């Protein structure tokens, strides 16, 4: 039971972290302007479509790549969207770091799968 207690303690600490607080504030500011939300949504839609094409083995359409680059150029000039993306990235980095710490503590977990992949 102590493991679960510690997990809940970690969850509480995460919810009080500066990374999460900064993310929440940046998200609220972003969502206060529908144009910003639409611009970010459009960028992410284009980004996902391009990633899906690559993952399915297709060569991305050059026009789609250009549209994504232009969309990125536009949103990178918007301080509200940029602040949101930076806060989102910092929170994601924190969560990834914590996940790595947890996985590294269990070196045998998943080892058989990794060994099997390495054999191929």
UniProtKB/Swiss-Prot annotation:
InterPro entries for this protein: Com_YlbF, YheA/YmcA-like_dom_sf
Pfam families: Com_YlbF
Family the UniProt entry places it in: Belongs to the UPF0342 family.
Name this polypeptide is given: UPF0342 protein Moth_0821
């Amino acid at each position: 039971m102590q493991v679960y207690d510690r997990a809940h303690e970690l969850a509480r600490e995460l919810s009080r972290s500066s990374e999460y607080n900064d993310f929440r504030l940046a998200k609220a500011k972003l969502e206060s302007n529908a144009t910003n939300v639409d611009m970010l949504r459009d960028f992410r839609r284009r980004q996902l479509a391009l990633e899906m094409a690559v993952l399915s083995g297709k060569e991305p359409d050059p026009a789609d790549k250009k549209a994504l680059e232009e969309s990125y150029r536009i949103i990178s000039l918007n301080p509200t969207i940029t602040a949101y993306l930076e806060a989102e990235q910092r929170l994601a980095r924190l969560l990834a770091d914590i996940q790595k710490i947890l996985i590294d503590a269990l070196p045998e977990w998943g080892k058989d799968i990794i060994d099997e992949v390495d054999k191929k």
